[in-house]
Amino acid sequence: MAKTTKRASSFRRLMIFAIIALISLAFGVRYLFHNSNATDLQKILQNLPKEISQSINSANNIQSSDSDLVQHFESLAQEIRHQQEVQAKQFDKQRKILEKKIQDLKQTPPEATLRERIAMTFPYDSHVKFPAFIWQTWSNDEGPERVQDIKGMWESKNPGFAHEVLNHDVINALVHHYFYSIPEILETYEALPSIILKIDFFKYLILLVHGGVYADIDTFPVQPIPNWIPEELSPSDIGLIVGVEEDAQRADWRTKYIRRLQFGTWIIQAKPGHPVLREIISRIIETTLQRKRDDQLNVNLRNDLNIMSWTGSGLWTDTIFTYFNDFMRSGVREKVTWKLFHNLNQPKLLSDVLVFPKFSFNCPNQIDNDDPHKKFYFITHLASQFWKNTPKVEQK
């Protein structure tokens, strides 16, 4: 019994030591673990600014690399655009050279008449669109600021149109460029004794080559050019657009006009090569060269009738009526006279010529909303007649 009690007491002491050892071991492990975590955390905190800095630097490097890449692409795109512009200029230059060679190859027969040579060099295609050109001429009598204002009005009403305002030097260069193969045209242009006659001649010439709209510099657009042709008409059926200049109501009309009803020349829209243009150019050539042979080139510029009958609206009117009454050209069977356009109040299409009323290209400065003609008001014309200020007679 005493021996059993001794064994039990020894076992209890052993258990107590074991428990104490386990507790000590647990505290030791915890202490070590705690110190280890603290050290790691401290290291992490110490290294954190460095890692953040590295990340920021890395991001900056990436951004810098992207910026360099974008700059490289922009530089490359600019270089490509420059090369395209250079190529476009080269192509345009080659095109002009090719056009000149093609024109040189258009050899007309030696026996061809003047009209045949003009027709072969500048053929007419009624099915092409009206070219989007606006042609105007500028004399020194119009100040450059005013010319720029007028040019701006035309361009604001007609975006997308090529618009050229040409002075006398440019006109001279263009005439010699386009018509060197028809010497009679060059001789006529040089022989015409005044600027106004040359400008009249040039307006027909430039429309013959390029087509589009010719407008005197003292005209102002009320509506865009594409609005001129009524919706019920097809542009492919029209080759020439003109307006009535004068529809005389008085018996003494001969003191101011060549014809009782005249078509104006301050606004003309045409397709290239139109037969009316070819004919009026031929008539001006014949008249001018005959006057040159007869030494009768002096002209009284203050007499409107002289200009109208030589290069202006009188000759223009006669040429158009000749076209109407030539069945082989116009296809019109009945005889056409001024009476067909007398008191015209809406556009009239005859053959491929669209004729507008007098008020269309000479509309009022003030337009009422209830004006019945409002939709056909296209142009305001000042009719400045700058040649009135020139000397009475110009001599070559």
Swiss-Prot record:
Its EC number is 2.4.-.-. It comes from Saccharomyces cerevisiae (strain ATCC 204508 / S288c). The chain crosses the membrane at residues 14-34. One of its GO terms (molecular function) is alpha-1,6-mannosyltransferase activity. GO terms for cellular component: mannan polymerase complex. This is Putative glycosyltransferase HOC1. Keywords: Glycoprotein, Glycosyltransferase, Golgi apparatus, Membrane, Signal-anchor, Transferase, Transmembrane, Transmembrane helix. It comes from the Eukaryota. Glycans are attached at N37. Pfam families: Gly_transf_sug. GO terms for biological process: cell wall mannoprotein biosynthetic process; protein N-linked glycosylation; substituted mannan metabolic process. It is found in: Golgi apparatus, cis-Golgi network membrane. Belongs to the glycosyltransferase 32 family. Residues 35-396 are lumenal. InterPro entries: GlycoTrfase_DXD_sugar-bd_CS (IPR007577), Nucleotide-diphossugar_trans (IPR029044), Och1-like (IPR039367). Component of the M-Pol II complex composed of ANP1, MNN9, MNN10, MNN11 and HOC1. Residues 2-13 are cytoplasmic. It is a single-pass type II membrane protein. The keyword Transmembrane applies. Present with 7160 molecules/cell in log phase SD medium. SUPFAM superfamilies: Nucleotide-diphospho-sugar transferases. Signal peptide: none annotated.
